[in-house]
Amino acid sequence: MEKSSETNGYLDSAQEGPAAGPGEPGTTARRAGRCAGFLRRHGLVLLTVSGVVAGAGLGAALRGLQLNRTQVTYLAFPGEMLLRMLRMIILPLVVCSLVSGAASLDASSLGRLGGIAIAYFGLTTLGASALAVALAFIIKPGSGSQTLQSSDLGLEDSGPPPVPKETVDSFLDLTRNLFPSNLVVAAFRTYATDYREVTYNTSAGKVTIEKIPIGTEIEGMNILGLVLFALVLGVALKKLGSEGEELIRFFNAFNEATMVLVSWIMWYVPVGIMFLVGSKIVEMKDIIMLVTSLGKYIFTSILGHFIHGGIVLPLIYFVFTRKNPFRFLLGLLTPFATAFATCSSSATLPSMMKCIEENNGVDKRISRFILPIGATVNMDGAAIFQCVAAVFIAQLNNVELRAGQIFTILVTATASSVGAAGVPAGGVLTIAIILEAIGLPTHDLSLILAVDWIVDRTTTVVNVEGDALGAGILHHLNQKAMKRGEQELSEVKVEAIPNSKSEEETSPLVTHPNPTGPAASTPESKESVL
């Protein structure tokens, strides 16, 4: 009897008789086919990584030409087009994916998966903050740098540090953004509290200055409000039943069409990344001075990202799934390269959705439900960078942090990182909130701004890695729950098989199909134990 031919190229040679020689046409054709298949599956990954390397080489080669600001802007134009295309697709992708994802899950699954996701995001961010504080106390990045000034770095054009906000106002802004007053405005503007100083002259001749909070709208998508609205809308459509099916199908079709657009944009990613990285390297005035002056701070932040992203998060994934986390991460090289080049979790969301579904087989209902939420609220890398920066500034000012202040850093970094998405200089603004909470000056934030472009790249990679591994864990737990449900259902069916006529007569709630065949015509004979 002939065996069916396998499609695996390694098995074909064993079944087709004697092995062909290295120069024979059969072996060459098979090798060419395998190479073509490999390039077809991993071509985009190879091109994206090559774009990062080529961008670094391009920037290093052009630094000697002393390009002016206008020429650097022209050089960055292809990269700017990539960012604009990715940001263009974020709004329909987030809204449609969350509506279709929430509508495709039943209420119990939605609550269970949502609870697991919130616990995962909160605990990993808190763990990242604790790791960062521990590393900062061990390495002491601020020791010996007390005389360092931002003017020494040649980066006066990095802009002034953001005006610090009161901690209470920051959390109130977070709540306000969860419930936008206008969904159209929320697509491109975010609520933020500003301050106006009012001077009062008292009767005693004293001058009193009062800082009054004023509500303003700043540029940037209010992703928090859109996420909450899309989730609630999906649940509401699910509750409507048959009346909401038409609208659910509309959002599903809109989501699929958006993913097609994403697949087209992804082929432009290598070109855009090359010019983004190259222009940023050309733009820096003195990289060597920057690294040597703030080297310990940069090293501490990147080391924290490496430990959390390379050890802690993969270990959590392995504990829950018992699978190789690095094989899972290998299918996400394109989103990681995009995150490294764009420094934006939201801009990486389209490529992350595409790769995690196609390369890693994560259920679309899981990925399209959890990834938009993770891109908004899960900021492990940002928490590490913010906690290291807070301890660094405390050491610069010779301030010994007490236990209460350390606890405040951990809680504030974990909570305020949720609202950092969509806000310009959001990470540095969060550091200002932390410094205000523990009573430290904010004038040294310009040093953090000077190296933000370096640290922010590994920060974004760790952020999106945490989202992806969280989606993988939820996918595994959901598959496990489904198998358990099928097993329980099969056990119920086995127990419902009638064993005697009396069981059928005394079980009016269980109906059985009429048996057919010879077994049905003869009664079941049983041995009497008497």
Swiss-Prot record:
PANTHER family: NEUTRAL AMINO ACID TRANSPORTER A, SODIUM/DICARBOXYLATE SYMPORTER-RELATED. Residues 140-216 are extracellular. This is Neutral amino acid transporter A. Glycans are attached at N201. Its main location: membrane. The modification Phosphoserine is found at S507, S525, S528. GO terms for molecular function: L-alanine transmembrane transporter activity; L-aspartate transmembrane transporter activity; L-serine transmembrane transporter activity; L-threonine transmembrane transporter activity; symporter activity. The lineage of its organism: Eukaryota, Metazoa, Chordata, Craniata, Vertebrata. It is a multi-pass membrane protein. The keyword Acetylation applies. It catalyses: L-threonine(in) + Na(+)(in) = L-threonine(out) + Na(+)(out); L-serine(in) + Na(+)(in) = L-serine(out) + Na(+)(out); L-cysteine(in) + Na(+)(in) = L-cysteine(out) + Na(+)(out); L-alanine(in) + Na(+)(in) = L-alanine(out) + Na(+)(out). Residues 1-28, 488-530 are annotated as: Disordered. Pfam families: SDF. It is found in: Membrane; Melanosome. It comes from Bos taurus (Bovine). Sodium-dependent neutral amino-acid transporter that mediates transport of alanine, serine, cysteine, proline, hydroxyproline and threonine.
